[in-house]
Amino acid sequence: MPDEPHESTTVATRKSDRRSSPRRAEYVVIECVTPQLDGGRYPVKRIVGDRVSVGADVIQAGHDTLGARVMCMGPDDGEWSASPMLYDFDTDRWYGAFVVDRIGRWKFTIEAWTDRFATWRSGLEKKVKAGQDVQLELSEGAQMARTASRSTRVATARASLLLTAKMLEDRRDTALEKRIQRALDEDLFALMQEHLRPSDLTRFPREITIVVDRELARAAAWYELFPRSQTTLVPGEPPRHGTFDDAAARLPRLAELGFDVVYLPPIHPIGRTFRKGKNNSLTPEADDVGSPWAIGNEQGGHDAIDPALGTLADFDRFVGAARGMGLEVALDYALQCSPDHPWVKEHPDWFNVRPDGSIQYAQNPPKKYQDIYPLNLWCDDRQALWNACRDIVLFWIGHGVTIFRVDNPHTKALAFWEWVIGEVQREHPETIFFAEAFTRPKRMNALAKLGFTMSYTYFTWKNSSWELREYLSELTHSPMVEYYRGNLFVNTPDILHEYLVHGGRPAFRVRLLLAATLSPLYGMYSGFELAENVPVREGSEEYADSEKYQLRPRNYEVEGNINSDIARINGIRRCHPAFQWNANLSFHTSENPTILFYRKARSEPVVQWTGSSPLHVPAAIAKSLGFGDDAGDDFLVAVNTDPRHVQETMVHVPIHDMGIDDDRPYVVRDLLSDARYTWRGVRNYVRLDPHETPGHVFLVERDAVRDLA
């Protein structure tokens, strides 16, 4: 016989029992909610008008029927909106959707519950089919109808529910068949779904944020120009410093070429101390204009205009002219100062002060940038500094600019960017922030997560077909699609890749076609259309006579330009929605790996990301939720990545994905040349001479497919 427990043991056991009593227990479990980023720490991104696909695993004990709904709230909404979720047996998962019809910050969450009436109704139906007695079940149904009547404020619904309860319990005057018929009636089911309150309603503990941006954040063609170089090139004469009016004269041609955004490097007064000369010389001449990234002198800082460009009124006129042509102006937002910037005298503590009292200039050893002082965004007076940096953005928004290309954000405190972007977009949700961060992938991803609308990419250094395939697959078919919008710039004032240096004009045409068809966001810097490819020295990515340090007027219509390519490709992008999406990109086999072959599908797949794994929403569910509009066109793109030699291959067409039978011929039309080809089956022949064309952009002509059948 075991010993009697000591009193102390008994007391401890009782205390333990009290401690283990649950304060609150949820009968229904909601988990694996999508979309969400890092457990809800950061918002996911969408574009206004998008239908957001939502998913969740909803679990409980037993076999009762469950119900679930998406709760969403848009900007300035006073209350939550609910939309039902649908259950898929095969994936054992719930799916829902809602449309984000305004820009700004949205939030959503999931609610789930035991659907008592649906559970009761299903059991009743099974017992009726089995010929079992259901009198007690009908009484239970009557009780639920009365409960629902007490919770509704709709008089007609209350009356109908009370009448139903009476009918279900009426054994004397109502035939059993009629009572059963009413119990299983679809109208009653709908009524109960609306008015019977769940007894175990469970809400997912987090509200997930979605940042909804305007359309230009997803699809746009960017063009970078220095206003000071937009003058006429006169042989034998020194170049004249351009103005905003000179730059405005170029806008009609840029609009004609199909660009959407005109991006300007810094337009502020340029420092004089340690001013850089031509080709980054440390010994400038008297007429050298300096680098516009050395911001500020006695004429002002980040909220001032370089007088050589014009006045603030001239800038306002330039912005207005651009808008009148369907173009938007983007400004460079570079948080750094020249030694002559007003802030250096007014707030020396906003910079890194060395032990000898001097201010630390920018450097990336062994490189030195004596003309630039970095700001110390983690200084003791950072609240005032952060406010001043925010006010710069707000100032230019006041002058019609709502797109900012941010210079080297990875060298500033991440917490600052999350704060300043949130501050600006709270008041001006239409504002776009573009991160110019060529750094480690995790740092680039972090900037995108914390708020940057779009980001530069490694595209410039991805030139072989396998590199492009691998990198673009990461951008478009990984969890990065929830937060990272890559803008594929083909060149920048800092980056002239050797592919362009050694590949000549055909290489420029190849890179243009790739960037503009692989991504809805792409851009170029002035001179690309002229195939400028002379580096300052062999092996360098710096341009000779770099426009960063001197005036570079050009004749943009000189022989050998690729303007016709630009206009045609941008026209294709605008006319066909398939080139305005990301996730509809898929790569397919080319038996010659030098030729890259890919498809831009007529619609984006409905995919949810659970961790690093994709979960495709079942087609029937997606269609019921409003996805799957197949009204667009399918495109097949073949590009020769070798700019020197003719290449030929057999490409493997994904005909089954496009709904084309194995033995059916189909017509593809090249939108670059207007040539038509009749293909059959999966394997088809492609030959590309880079001196004639960089590739094909095939439109699959579905009417022709039907005619050939």
Question: Could you describe each region identified by the protein language model?
Answer:
Residues 333, 437, 492, 640-641, ...:
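Residues immediately flanking
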Residues 1-228, 232, 236-260, 269, ...:
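Carbohydrate-interacting/catalytic domains
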Residues 292-320, 324-327, 337-564, 581-582, ...:
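Alpha-amylase-like alpha-glycosidases and glucanotransferases acting on alpha-linked glucans and related
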